Regions:
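Active-site acidic catalytic loop and adjacent metal/ATP-binding pocket
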Residues: 18-20, 139-183
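The N-lobe alphaC helix and its flanking beta3-alphaC-beta4 segment of protein kinase-like domains
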Residues: 35-51
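Short beta-strand micro-motifs within the conserved protein kinase catalytic domain, predominantly
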Residues: 57-68
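Short pocket-lining segment of the protein kinase catalytic domain that shapes the ATP-binding cleft
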Residues: 70-78
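Internal "kinase-insert"/substrate-recognition segments embedded within catalytic cores
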Residues: 88-117
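An alpha-helical support segment within catalytic cores of ATP-dependent transferases
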Residues: 107-154, 164, 250-256
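Helix-rich C-terminal or lid/interface subdomains of diverse kinases
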Residues: 187-257
């Protein structure tokens, strides 16, 4: 039977569809996604697996129906995001679990992964809604912030954390880098903030408590992280908030401003 069948579809994303077949996950990328980027993602995820973190093992890269696919281990279980949706009263408990997992991840050296600072620099440079002065200010701030050399996920939120029989597993490592734990935590804070302040503040509290760091040290990264996020949301509903967090004014003010 063809593994790429609607009956086997378990998820859709911006870049790929995800299928489950014969107890194996097939991440089938959309047409136009390059072989280089698929091989890169597979390599990053396998490096993370080899480092001892709980994440699906990569079996290989294949071509299916003219598209590239990553074949990987199936990690069964609901995401923490799904659990939070179904049981709102337990949301703080799940946030605390996620924070503890991120703190644990940040104890692992990130050598061999792409540079977080380089990623942030390139993203800020490409943001079309920021003026050159605003970009320069963010880059100067980035240079002034201390950088660790630890594993950073880059997109650490509840839907990328799976609760399995053996514990929590982390998926979707395409944005992984070697860099600052505080910056990675700040990115998570921002992702929560874009959906509501209450969860964002709760997560920040749990992370800082378990990492033994101050909220102020995490939030020092917020202008840089928000500025870099504009490469993803530069035309979306969140652009005004992101510009404000980045300490910048719109490059092209709307009428009446």
């Amino acid at each position: 039977m063809n593994p790429i069948h609607p009956d086997h579809l378990i998820g859709r994303g911006a870049q790929a569809d995800v299928y489950l077949y014969d107890n194996q996950v097939i991440k089938l990328f959309h047409e136009g996604v390059s072989e280089e980027s698929v091989l890169y993602e597979a390599d990053i995820q396998q490096r993370i697996y080899n480092a001892g973190l709980s994440t699906p093992q990569v079996y290989g890269v294949a071509t299916m129906e003219g598209r590239y696919a990553i074949l990987m281990e199936h990690v069964p279980g609901p995401s923490l995001g799904e659990l939070m949706e179904k049981d709102r009263p337990r949301a703080p408990e799940y946030l605390k679990q996620a924070a503890a997992l991120q703190v644990q991840m940040h104890k692992i050296p990130g050598h061999g992964l792409p540079s977080q600072q380089d990623k942030l620099r390139s993203r800020i440079a490409l943001v079309s809604v920021l003026s050159e002065d605003a970009k320069q200010n963010l880059l100067l701030l980035l240079d002034s912030l201390a950088a660790d050399q630890v594993v950073c996920h880059g997109d650490f939120h509840p839907y990328n954390i799976i609760r399995t029989e053996k514990g929590l597993a982390i998926i979707d490592w395409v944005d992984a880098s070697c860099g600052s734990a505080l910056a990675d935590a700040c990115r998570s804070y921002l992702l929560y903030l874009l959906h509501g302040k209450e969860a964002a503040e709760a997560y920040l509290h749990f992370y800082c408590e378990q990492a033994n760091v101050s909220k102020e040290d995490v939030l020092k990264w917020l202008p840089v992280i928000a500025g870099a996020r504009l490469i993803e949301d530069g035309r979306g509903d969140d652009v005004e908030l992101l510009l404000r967090l980045a300490g910048a004014s719109p490059l092209h003010p709307t009428k009446g401003e």
